[in-house]
């Protein structure tokens, strides 16, 4: 049993426990409810209890008040039924192969360890480590909501007995109390692939949306929405659809999802579809309610495809991407492109306003920011932001090749800023791996900030390292490392992610992990001053305060 239909009278305000007014038709409510432990007990229990209650009430109306022992037996029988249902394995979400949505509380915060492409050298893999906040093409991982003073976040977690079984996890940091709850296990993705990590967004009603991505087309993708606003205790699976050939059809697969919620306008999503027709075709779609989505728009399909990173404001959405030249394989990624829309995807243009016809299929496109193919350099995308004038700034690394190790140095962190008339491209600093990933902050006073694992870690030339904070006060012309946030770590720190509307007390979140062998992975976050907090791996209470990793500093940067 995966779904049921309940007739409801038009206009009735339903309890949102599995019944959401946003999914209501004219006179019937059709909503998929995952038959997890709680929903099954609720449904079956009431199906048994209500007839008993009606029997008792009818007896009263007819003047035949049931004898006290009989009434007591009915109560005891009801209690027994509910107790037995708790013990039946097939109704337990952990035991049911048909149950997707778990809605269970975990015992702590544990990130997934993942590797890709063994290299047969001292670095062991092309990339690897604690990748609970991987990858750069997944975003956002966290959203700050001022109304409730909480930063909600998701990550790729794992079980207590494995470092490599991917669970989709959701939690929050309470800025009023400084505490975190036990995280919620949303679902088991049935893989060890961190490319299936979840992403998060929050709509203007406060409902938390989790998009469960897939690496390619071999596994299904899912969408969930929180049962209650600003609450992570329970989620409902949403049966999302798109328009295809003028018909509504289910959405069952997407990759590298990047959902953004625009206040008063709805959702915009950048994502990838494999073999559509390019190996990695980058796409775009919109939705007013998160349920019914527009027709998929192919943005670009040059040669073997692309990776993209996107951003959105109230007025526009933009994406930067590279491309895979034909015949060279997906490890060769080069060039830098940028396009944007100011009307929710109806029209698209370059940064200079020139209109584009999509999909883009030729590498010599007017959207080209810089020709790195001609320089023999790979391009690894990291982050993108709009500045205070809503002009794009792109953060990326260039290197000589895909393999780990010094032979492909320098790995140069670079910014590309649209000035209004031209792209201004400036080197920032270097690190030792193509998959070192950090976030760019453009603050109201004009400060540019990067929080990233640029410092050599315990596993040199593997992804990540020690986290550092860099500042620029002149639009990226020069950078100063103002603080090293971690030091003498046993494992490399990786993928520092910026929350949407980042609050100074929760400014970045990341994970650690060994760069050359499977290991445990711990999650961390830092404040704007660079103080690092550890999310607890084991919790014996429902709420706790994360511990400082080092002595707190009040120096402001």
What are these regions (language model features)?
Residues 1-97:
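Intrinsic disorder/low-complexity segments
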Residues 97-557:
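Extracellular, repeat-based ectodomains that mediate carbohydrate processing or recognition
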């Amino acid at each position: 049993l995966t779904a049921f239909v309940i007739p409801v009278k038009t206009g009735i305000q339903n309890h949102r426990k599995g019944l959401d007014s946003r999914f209501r038709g004219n006179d019937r409510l059709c909503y998929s409810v995952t038959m997890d432990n709680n929903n099954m007990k609720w449904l079956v229990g009431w199906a048994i209890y209500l007839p008993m209650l009606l029997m008792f009430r009818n007896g009263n109306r007819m003047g035949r008040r049931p004898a006290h022992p009989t009434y007591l037996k009915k109560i005891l029988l009801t209690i027994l039924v509910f107790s037995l249902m708790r013990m039946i394995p097939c109704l337990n979400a952990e035991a049911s192969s048909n149950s997707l949505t778990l809605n269970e509380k975990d015992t702590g915060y544990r990130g997934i360890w993942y590797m890709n492409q063994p290299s047969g050298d001292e670095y062991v893999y092309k990339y690897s480590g604690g990748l609970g906040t991987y990858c750069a093409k997944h975003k956002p991982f966290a959203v700050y909501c001022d109304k409730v003073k909480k930063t909600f976040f998701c990550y790729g977690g794992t079980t207590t007995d494995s470092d490599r079984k991917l669970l989709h996890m959701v939690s929050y940091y309470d800025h009023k109390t400084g505490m975190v709850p036990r995280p919620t296990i949303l679902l088991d993705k049935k893989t060890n692939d961190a490319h299936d990590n979840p992403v998060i967004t929050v709509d203007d009603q406060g409902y938390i949306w989790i998009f469960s991505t897939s690496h390619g087309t071999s596994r299904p993708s899912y969408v969930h929405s929180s049962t209650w606003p600003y609450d992570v205790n329970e989620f409902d699976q949403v049966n999302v659809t798109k328009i295809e050939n003028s018909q509504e059809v289910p959405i069952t697969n997407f990759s590298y999802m990047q959902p953004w919620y625009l206040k008063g306008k709805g959702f915009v999503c950048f994502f990838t579809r494999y073999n559509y027709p390019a190996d990695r075709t980058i796409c775009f779609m919109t939705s007013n309610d998160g349920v019914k989505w527009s027709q998929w728009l192919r943005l670009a399909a040059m040669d073997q495809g692309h990776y993209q990173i996107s951003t959105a404001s109230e007025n526009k959405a933009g994406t930067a991407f590279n491309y895979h030249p034909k015949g060279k394989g997906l490890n060769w990624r080069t060039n830098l492109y940028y396009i944007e829309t100011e009307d929710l995807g109806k029209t698209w243009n370059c940064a200079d306003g020139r209109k584009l016809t999509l999909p883009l299929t030729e590498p010599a496109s007017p959207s080209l920011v810089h020709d790195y193919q001609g320089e023999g350099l790979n391009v690894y995308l990291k982050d993108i932001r709009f500045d205070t004038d809503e002009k794009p700034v792109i953060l990326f690394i260039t290197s000589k090749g895909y393999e780990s190790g010094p032979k492909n140095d320098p790995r140069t962190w670079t910014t590309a800023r649209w000035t209004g008339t031209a792209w201004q491209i400036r080197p920032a600093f270097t690190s030792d791996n193509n998959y070192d990933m950090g976030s760019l902050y453009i603050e109201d006073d004009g400060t540019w900030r990067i929080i990233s694992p640029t410092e050599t870690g315990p596993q040199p030339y593997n992804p990540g390292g020690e986290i550092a904070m860099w500042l620029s006060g002149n639009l990226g012309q020069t950078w100063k490392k103002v603080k090293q946030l971690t030091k003498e770590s046993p494992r490399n720190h990786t993928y520092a992610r910026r929350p949407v509307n980042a609050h100074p007390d929760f400014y970045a979140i990341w994970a650690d992990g060994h760069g050359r062998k499977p290991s445990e992975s711990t999650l961390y976050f830092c404040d704007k001053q660079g103080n690092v907090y550890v999310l607890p791996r084991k919790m014996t209470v429902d709420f706790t305060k994360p511990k400082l990793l080092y002595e707190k500093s009040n120096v402001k940067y």
